[in-house]
Swiss-Prot record:
The lineage of its organism: Bacteria, Bacillati, Bacillota, Bacilli, Bacillales. It is an enzyme of class 5 (isomerase). The keyword Magnesium does not apply. HAMAP family: Trigger_factor_Tig. NCBIfam families: tig. Residues 163-248 form the PPIase FKBP-type domain. Keywords: Cell cycle, Cell division, Chaperone, Cytoplasm, Isomerase, Rotamase. This is Trigger factor.
Length: 425
């Protein structure tokens, strides 16, 4: 086999590939063995039709497509290795010559990984993040704990206020007609939660238990039910009961209830401070890592092929679909609820996809420029760390990974980011 690579404009080039006639004939033989198994011919058992009779009846040309399916992937794979190129999309194949007893000649128009011209990536100036925890931070965290342990108690007197829970009956009407899904009884509505459409909860504020009111609202233009989107509606609302949050007293008993590991309120405050300090430190480290990577990416010159962005978009959509499934949803339901579609979703994701591709390419270039390597010991240590984290045997982690090559590449990327941070100004 012979291959010649010719660079065209941008990140596109053409591979001209010639495969020896012997391999061509071998692929045609393999195609015959595959096809003949499916043919029934009177006088012969299935799959036993002689080759000369097959070619006489169907023509050797009838085997060419199956033969090409066999020979092309192998020839193309060997050709890209020989040319030393890295395709980022499926090639456009053009068969120039394919026949029995002759060399196969074909071209493959290929989009390849772009050249990355690294800009400044050492000594990058990054903003130092404040990690000090104040008394106010601790008090706010304590208040959040207090809110989470609050109990709802019936409000005997007074009106609905923001933060209360109103137990209501409601029925919605559009153009004087009730609509499906617009009715509820004894519904506990947390006022200020934004659960209902804009303007609804605000109009319940001020009502007393037993009072009724017509609430006038309009459905948002992007509402998931197209027949209601943008339309004005009237909801007949009756308040049955008002509940308000009763916060527990801040004392040692509260502290023990909130965290079994502490005995006093002071101990709880100290633990909250430590947790906040660790959280802020972790957040600051992540911010610096993100910032140096983004700066290095912005400083580089890259002509990113659209095919790489499309591939990343497909990956991002699959990731999004997996997250939806964990919430008991799927893409079709998401499109219905949000009034969007596959094209709009990809358009929303495109900027992030471009950013991801650029960052990945720049980090790969830095790994190469700085000769960043990962040892077998480092990979083993990471596998052991994963085993401990997930509570699984090391062998089970190795089996789940299949190959550790991807893990090794991830570790190289991590090292590249470490390098950027260590060399930042």
């Amino acid at each position: 086999m012979a291959a010649k690579w010719e660079k065209l404009e941008g990140n596109v080039g053409v591979l001209t590939i010639e495969v020896d006639a012997k391999e061509v004939n071998n692929s045609i033989d393999a195609a015959f063995k595959k096809v003949v198994k499916t043919i029934n011919v009177p006088g012969f058992r299935k799959g036993k039709m002689p080759r000369p009779l097959f070619e006489q009846r169907f023509g050797v040309e009838s085997l060419y497509q199956d033969a090409l399916d066999i020979i092309l992937p192998k020839a193309y794979g060997e050709a890209i290795d020989e040319a030393g190129i890295f395709p980022v999309a499926h090639p456009e194949i053009d068969i120039e010559k394919f026949e029995k007893n002759a060399n196969l000649i074909f071209t493959a128009k290929v989009t390849v990984k772009p050249e990355v011209k690294l800009g400044e990536y050492k000594g990058l100036a990054v903003e130092k993040v404040e990690t000090t925890v104040t008394d106010e931070d601790v008090e706010n965290e304590l208040k959040s704990l207090q809110e989470r342990q609050a109990e709802l108690v019936v409000k005997e007197e007074g009106t609905v206020e923001n933060g209360d829970t109103a137990v209501i009956d409601f029925e919605g009407f559009v153009d004087g007609e009730a609509f499906e899904g617009g009715k509820g009884e004894n519904y506990s509505l947390a006022i200020g939660s934004g659960t209902f459409i804009p303007g609804f909860e605000e109009q319940v504020i001020g009502l007393k238990s037993g009072e009724s009111k017509d609430v006038e609202v309009s459905f948002p233009e992007e509402y998931h039910a197209a027949e209601l989107a943008g339309k004005p509606a009237t909801f007949k609302v009756t308040v049955h009961e008002i509940k308000t949050k009763e916060l527990p007293e801040l004392n040692d008993e509260f502290a023990k209830e909130a965290d079994e590991a502490v005995a006093t309120l002071d101990e709880l405050k100290a633990k909250l401070r430590t947790n906040l300090e660790e959280g802020k430190k972790h957040e600051a480290e992540h911010k610096v890592r993100d910032e140096v990577v983004e700066l290095a990416a912005a400083n580089a010159e890259i002509d990113i092929p659209e095919a790489m962005i499309d591939t990343e978009l497909d990956r991002m959509v699959r990731e999004f679909e997996q997250r939806l499934s964990q919430q008991g949803m799927n893409l079709e339901l998401y499109y219905q609820f949000t009034g969007t579609d596959a094209d709009k979703l990809k358009e929303q994701m495109k900027e992030d996809a471009q950013k991801r591709v650029r960052i990945n390419l720049v980090l790969e270039a830095i790994i190469e420029a700085e000769n960043i390597e990962v040892t077998e010991e480092e990979v083993t240590a990471e596998v052991e760390k994963m085993a401990e984290m997930y509570g699984m045997p090391v062998d089970a982690i190795k089996q789940a990974l299949g190959s550790v090559d991807a893990l090794a590449e991830d570790l190289k990327v991590r090292k590249a980011v470490d390098f950027l941070v260590e060399n930042a100004a």
